Amino acid sequence: MNQENNKAAFNNEHICSKMTNASIKNIKTPCHKNLVYTSAGDNANLIKWITGNRNFDLWITHYGNYQGRYRELADYYNIRKDGKFPNLYHAYHVWPYIFKQYEAILVMDDDILISPAKINRLFKIRKKYDLWILQPAFDPKGKISHRITRVKPYTMLRYTNFVEVTCPLFRQDKLERFMRIYNPVLVGWGVDWWFLDVLRNDMKDKIAIIDWVTCINPLDSTKDGKREIDRLQTPNQRLETWKKIKRMHCIQNEEKGQMEYAFVPKPLPLIFVSKILNLGQSLKRIILKLFESIRFYLNS
């Protein structure tokens, strides 16, 4: 009952915020068919996402202390202090007509290290394979919370039953379906299992981890000693909230564990090039010169 009251209070807040949205910045019409959404503090890595050509618009919900920070980077901008998915829930219910104009939406932590070229490729892969939810694989230079999300060198993508909450990319209608059910009292722990449970029917070949696109999730040791999410709720609070949500919605997929069903192999030339890039500099130069000689011979 308390959770239902919390959700009702949350919805009332939406109505108020819709009437007083002076902090909003938005473009009149989308420039692209894809959207990246993030809830950003004052130490985000957002500039790295947009330095270069891109096939996506950017929505920033700022929860930091420096008023107007990142506003010039955003296509859509609002101010609200909460977690990533509660802030997304708020935005989705206040401005649903904006989200519905997009084909796909990447919901990303603000500290993820990734280039616009890689984000572009994620959206292209989603469309090519008609995926419902996907994520970039995690580079081992950063934090890896689930072994299944660690990049594998010889596959382009792996069909799985799991995508982590850190940076999931949704087909728009699938995100909308989850937003109808989601309760913003759940800040972090278990959100991924919940949105996967919503899509549990016929989701084979629709959920994937993309090894061809990697990102770095910075280690906690590189931050100021405390995770932003811990400022909202302690780990114990998040775990207890997740247990209550699981019971209320009969969510059982977490107990079944994470699985890979199938994979798409990386093309052989890409595998070979990646191997070359890991060789010593002198041997690399020899092989590249050999390639140039072969190409010159074939073109002559």
Spans of features found by a protein language model:
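N-proximal low-complexity "stem/linker" segments adjacent to membrane-targeting elements
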Residues: 1-72
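C-terminal catalytic/acceptor-binding lobe
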Residues: 2-23, 34-35, 185-300
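Active-site-proximal specificity loops/subdomain of glycosyltransferases
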Residues: 47, 60-103
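Short beta-alpha junction loops
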Residues: 64-66, 137-142, 213-214
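Short, hinge-like loop/turn segments at secondary-structure boundaries
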Residues: 77, 150-154, 226-228
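Short beta-strand-to-loop acidic/aromatic patch adjacent to the donor-nucleotide binding site
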Residues: 101-113
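Conserved catalytic core of nucleotide-sugar-dependent glycosyltransferases
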Residues: 115-201
